[in-house]
């Protein structure tokens, strides 16, 4: 069940959280993800107004805005989530970790795919902005405050404004 996957992932990726009980009661990121999962089911069932109301509830209580039309995979973790914004056509793979202030935003008002697609096992650092219909490959890392407007091949690291790609991820890269 995805709810238990989300708890396990949160425990695995947040060394400050010691128990599932603690995570359950104190993680705004986890709460926002759970409300998103319910709102997304309602969105797919064409209960759009109710899904948007639930999303606004989560935003009010967590400071995290996830559009119910976004598609998010398993074991998704938002750590220190205040200010996170995930747009309507964003797609996020499995085992993704994002930090506070991250935006997965669009750059057009046209009713098309306008938000990023994020692969599996991606880490997105605090304050990073991923803008437009771009693809972030599997096993990538986006550094804190990077602005990414172009596709990232699998296994790369993006840093800076406008982000530049550096060869590949290694153990000694500290991005966040």
Q: What do these predicted ranges mean?
A:
Residues 1-62, 173-176:
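Terminal amphipathic alpha-helical/low-complexity segments used for targeting or macromolecular assembly
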Residues 62, 67-68, 73-74, 79-88, ...:
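Left-handed beta-helix
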């Amino acid at each position: 069940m995805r709810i238990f996957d989300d708890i396990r992932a949160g425990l695995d990726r947040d060394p400050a959280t010691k128990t599932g009980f603690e995570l359950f009661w104190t993680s705004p990121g986890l709460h926002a993800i759970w409300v998103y999962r319910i709102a997304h089911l309602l969105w797919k069932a064409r209960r759009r107004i109710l899904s948007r109301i639930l999303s606004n509830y989560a935003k009010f209580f967590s400071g995290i805005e996830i559009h119910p039309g976004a598609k998010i995979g398993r074991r998704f973790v938002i750590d220190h989530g205040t200010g996170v914004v995930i747009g309507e056509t964003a797609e996020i793979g499995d085992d993704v970790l994002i930090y506070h202030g991250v935006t997965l935003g669009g750059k057009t008002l046209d009713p098309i795919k306008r938000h990023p697609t994020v692969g599996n096992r991606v880490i997105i650092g605090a304050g990073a902005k991923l803008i437009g219909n771009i693809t972030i490959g599997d096993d990538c890392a986006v550094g804190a405050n990077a602005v990414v407007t172009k596709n990232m091949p699998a296994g790369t690291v993006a840093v800076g404004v406008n982000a530049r790609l550096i060869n590949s991820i290694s153990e000694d890269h500290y991005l966040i």
